[in-house]
Amino acid sequence: DYYASRGLGDVYKRQVFMDIFESLNSVLVDLFNDILNIEERALITEEFKDISVTDMHIIEAVGIEEPRTMSTISKSLGVTMGTLTVGINGLVKKGYVTRKRGEKDRRIVYASLTDKGIAAYRHHENFHKDMIENITKDLTKEEAEVLTKTFIRLEDFFHQLP
């Protein structure tokens, strides 16, 4: 190896690693912050000014299909039932979510979106669709596949964290 023959192998590798580490760290931190800021500006419009990005993520987790149990929603968001209950209570008061106890087992509580909640869900869905379209519009099929695989690995890493 060229660098090893000049006694620079380990030093060079360490420097390359640090450059990559610093670049990736900077990009990831900036990217997460940018996504949160952009999402907040894009999602909280005049129509939905009474909810936060966190509320919007709860709305997304409730979904537009059949009612979901509070337990299922809390697991999908990775939050405690207490935390979810506080968020759902606020969304019920604002008219985005309804709550109903199970008919067979009254201990089970189901949440579903109102028409207002469905409109917020669609707004959020369109934001994500537009974001993905803009990110991928200038990529080749191969570049899009590499980007997708990279994000899947990143997601897998985050899911393995305690």
Label the model's feature ranges.
Residues 89-146:
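Charged, amphipathic alpha-helical coiled-coil/dimerization segments
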Residues 13-49:
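N-terminal leader segment of winged-helix/HTH proteins
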Residues 1-15:
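Single conserved hydrophobic/aromatic residue that forms the stacking wall/gate
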Residues 38-82:
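N-terminal helix-turn-helix DNA-binding core of bacterial DNA-binding proteins
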Residues 60-64, 125, 152:
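Short, locally clustered residues in the helix-turn-helix/winged-helix DNA-binding domain
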Residues 20-24, 31, 126-162:
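Terminal interaction helix/tail motif
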